[in-house]
C-alpha cells in the first residue's frame, strides 16, 4: 500500500480549480440556456429531411417518394434496403433508434412520426 501511494504521489497531476465569480456564472448560465434542447424540430422540417434522405437512396426513384410511401410495397425495396434507410435517418437526425423500433419503421410516415416524437432529434 505504501508503494502504491508513493507511485501515485509522483504520477498525480495537480489540478487547478477555476474561481468563478458571479459574472462568469451568469455567462455560463446564458450559454446553457441556449444549448438546451427546448427547440424541437417542426413537423415540416422532419418531413422534408426524411423525404430527402429517402430520395437520396440509390435504389429509389425520387419522383415516387411521398410522406405516405411504403419502402417495400411502393418503392420495391427489400428488408436490407429498409435497414440502410433507417440507418441513414439515424445519421441525419443524430439519433440511435433501438432495434425493436427500427424494425417497425417501414414507411416514410412511420419514420417521420418516430423522429418528430423523439425528444433528442436534431
UniProtKB/Swiss-Prot annotation:
The keyword S-adenosyl-L-methionine does not apply. One of its GO terms (biological process) is fatty acid biosynthetic process. The modification O-(pantetheine 4'-phosphoryl)serine is found at residue 79. Residues 1-34 form a transit peptide. Signal peptide: none annotated. Belongs to the acyl carrier protein (ACP) family. This is Acyl carrier protein 1, mitochondrial. It comes from Arabidopsis thaliana (Mouse-ear cress). The lineage of its organism: Eukaryota, Viridiplantae, Streptophyta, Embryophyta, Tracheophyta. The gene is MTACP1.
Amino acid at each position: 500500500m505504501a508503494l502504491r501511494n508513493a507511485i501515485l504521489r509522483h504520477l498525480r497531476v495537480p489540478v487547478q480549480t477555476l474561481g468563478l465569480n458571479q459574472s462568469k456564472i451568469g455567462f455560463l448560465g446564458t450559454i446553457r440556456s441556449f444549448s438546451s434542447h427546448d427547440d424541437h424540430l417542426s413537423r415540416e422540417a422532419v418531413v422534408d429531411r426524411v423525404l430527402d434522405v429517402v430520395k437520396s437512396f440509390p435504389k429509389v426513384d425520387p419522383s415516387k417518394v411521398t410522406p405516405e410511401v411504403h419502402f417495400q410495397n411502393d418503392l420495391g425495396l427489400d428488408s436490407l434496403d429498409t435497414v440502410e434507410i433507417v440507418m441513414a435517418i439515424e445519421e441525419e437526425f443524430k439519433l440511435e433508434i433501438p432495434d425493436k423500433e427500427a424494425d417497425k419503421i417501414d414507411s416514410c410516415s412511420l419514420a417521420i412520426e418516430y423522429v418528430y416524437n423523439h425528444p433528442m432529434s436534431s
